[in-house]
Amino acid sequence: MSMAEVCCDSAVVVGAEAEARARARAGRRRRAGVEGAGRWNATATAAGVAAEEAATRKRRASGGEAGLVVVAKRHGAASVAGRRREMEDAVSLREAFAAPANGEVAAARCDFYGVFDGHGCSHVADACRERMHELVAEEMGAGSPAAAAREPASWTETMERSFARMDAEVIAGCRAESGSCRCEGQKCDHVGSTAVVAVVEESRVVVANCGDSRAVLCRGGAPVQLSSDHKPDRPDELERIEAAGGRVIFWEGARVLGVLAMSRSIGDAYLKPYVTAVPEVTVTGRSDFDECLILASDGLWDVVSNEAACEVAQSCLRRGRQRWCAEAAAVLTKLALARRSSDNISVVVVDLRRGNAL
């Protein structure tokens, strides 16, 4: 039995009994005066968006220290603040997100998943969680036959428009809320978020990425990276930044103007045009060898390779449990913590096996 398989036995705590244990542990820490000591508490939720939102509210109410595990038939997610004081990540899990509002049956079902890694404050990531899927659905022409037959070039345009609208919304919101938000910086426009989103259809997976969160497809036991990290020292990104009049300064790694460690993001109005919200988009056909899709923030990818992440997911899959996606997500967060990741860690695992994912 591999280490990953052993971890699966203890990584995920599900049900009322686990929730009671988590509450008891939190109470003991409060009485001992060590609240916020950074231990990982997982609170399981029921499947669906309502469960996700309830668990997120509970995590935020506890000051961002508690972990979040979401269990559903087609996907699982885990999110933990880790060694950070605040939780600034957000995840979005929206099944059949493009269903027509009038109750008609959509031409083809598709699901939406996203990971948003905020910086400076959580409100941009939170806004992306609440709105990005709606904007993508609107730009798709929700449920129309044209959406089902969309070509790769059209998908690129769809995602670019969606990200541009999301960027404009959060910048306008930041200006309106400036001075009333608990941001790290003096100004609300110093806040932003990465965005890696996936639209999963019956025949393909569409990924749009802006920042250094990442999407990896596990296919036949091997990883296929579906997005490219936007780092300031990536040659093409460095050229783009300098052409716009900006600079990349190496201070604890490559940073735009010595500040931001990514070259694309939602928000960050004070760094435009050097930091752009234009996503890179990939359209990948699904195959019978596909196992799962992993979306995660750099809190995972900084310390766990694509290969290791797929190995963990496969180990959980081989156990044959219905909740294996949630197990894999939780094991990956625990692995990142064990390897001393210094950031928030959020992981979404989507079942892509034929007959299971859709």
From Swiss-Prot:
Organism of provenance: Oryza sativa subsp. japonica (Rice)
Chief localisation class: nucleus
Free-text function comment from the UniProt entry: Involved in the regulation of abiotic stress responses. Acts as a negative regulator of abscisic acid (ABA) signaling and positive regulator of abiotic stress signaling. May be involved in panicle development.
Induction field: Induced by salt, osmotic and cold stresses. Induced by abscisic acid (ABA).
Protein family (similarity comment): Belongs to the PP2C family.
Disulfide-bond pairs as recorded: none
Catalyzed reaction equations: O-phospho-L-seryl-[protein] + H2O = L-seryl-[protein] + phosphate; O-phospho-L-threonyl-[protein] + H2O = L-threonyl-[protein] + phosphate
Subcellular location per the Swiss-Prot or TrEMBL entry: Nucleus; Cytoplasm, Cytosol
DNA damage as UniProt keyword: no
A family per Pfam: PP2C
Cofactor note: Binds 2 magnesium or manganese ions per subunit.
Manganese among keywords: yes
More info: Plants overexpressing P2C68 exhibit insensitivity to abscisic acid (ABA), and tolerance to high salt and mannitol stresses during seed germination, root growth and overall seedling growth. At adult stage, P2C68 overexpression leads to high tolerance to salt, mannitol and drought stresses with far better physiological parameters such as water loss, fresh weight, chlorophyll content and photosynthetic potential.
CDD domains the UniProt entry points to: PP2Cc
GO cellular component, one term: nucleus
EC number(s) reported in the record: 3.1.3.16
Sorted UniProt keywords: Cytoplasm, Hydrolase, Magnesium, Manganese, Metal-binding, Nucleus, Protein phosphatase, Stress response
Required co-factors: Mg(2+); Mn(2+)
The name this protein goes by in its record: Probable protein phosphatase 2C 68
Residues of the PPM-type phosphatase domain: 74-352
Superkingdom to which the source organism belongs: Eukaryota
Gene it is expressed from: PP2C68
GO BP field: regulation of intracellular signal transduction
InterPro entries cross-referenced by the UniProt entry: PP2C, PP2C_BS, PPM-type-like_dom_sf, PPM-type_phosphatase-like_dom
Residues annotated for Mn(2+) 2 binding in this entry: 117, 298, 343
